[in-house]
Regions:
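Conserved, well-structured functional cores that handle cations and Mg-NTP chemistry
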Residues: 1-193
Length: 193
């Protein structure tokens, strides 16, 4: 299989078993002339560096924003930021990289996953995977600080109650965009320092 074939099969988000997906791929793309086991596929896929997927993702995002007619709300482009904890396979390598959560039941390898999503154009524009004890605010600050999309003007970053902090407001005002804003839901007792 070529690098392109591995990437194509991997991003298909197969609804069937891996072997059924591989068989369908080879039937459609290679006229069924090749048989490939899921073990051989997994071994080959493991040789692909995660950076390849990051670069592919960034290329898709950049291409979209170069060419798309972007929707806006009263001249503003809205980007939601949120995070969650994601359970990962329990391997030593992942445990060392992302940490183990032990607060509920058996220990579980988890990562903090944060995402910035274009609310009006339906596109994930940035993500972060971090240690399970990392802060959603730190991930949001990092995504806001590295925000660089072509043809985006007047971005507004929308976040829930867990995010309000002066450091996030500062991060959004440091961007090169002329008008940048952050909008956070806050508890009633929230106090601005």
């Amino acid at each position: 299989m070529s690098f392109t074939d591995y990437i194509y099969v991997t991003v298909q988000n197969l609804k069937s078993s891996l072997q059924a997906g591989l068989n369908a791929f080879f039937d459609a793309q290679k006229d069924g002339q090749i048989e490939y086991s899921k073990q051989a596929f997994s071994k080959g896929r493991n040789r692909i560096k995660p950076e390849a997927f990051q670069e592919l993702f960034q290329s898709v995002v950049d291409s979209f924003y170069e060419k798309a007619e972007l929707a806006d709300w009263k001249g503003y482009q809205l980007f939601g930021i949120d995070g969650t904890r994601l359970n990962l396979p329990c391997t030593n390598e992942l445990a060392e990289l992302y940490g183990i959560q032990t607060s509920q039941g058996a220990p579980q390898v988890q990562a903090l996953v944060s995402c910035m999503y274009d609310l009006l154009n339906g596109m994930i524009v940035d993500t972060r995977f971090a240690h399970c004890r990392s802060s959603e605010r730190a991930a949001a600050k990092d995504m806001i600080g590295s925000f660089r999309l072509q043809n985006v003007s007047n971005p507004v970053f929308v976040m829930d109650r867990g995010y309000p902090a002066a450091e996030l407001i500062d991060a959004s005002t440091q961007l090169e965009a002329a008008d940048t804003a952050s909008l956070c839901a806050v508890p009633q007792n929230f106090c601005v320092p």
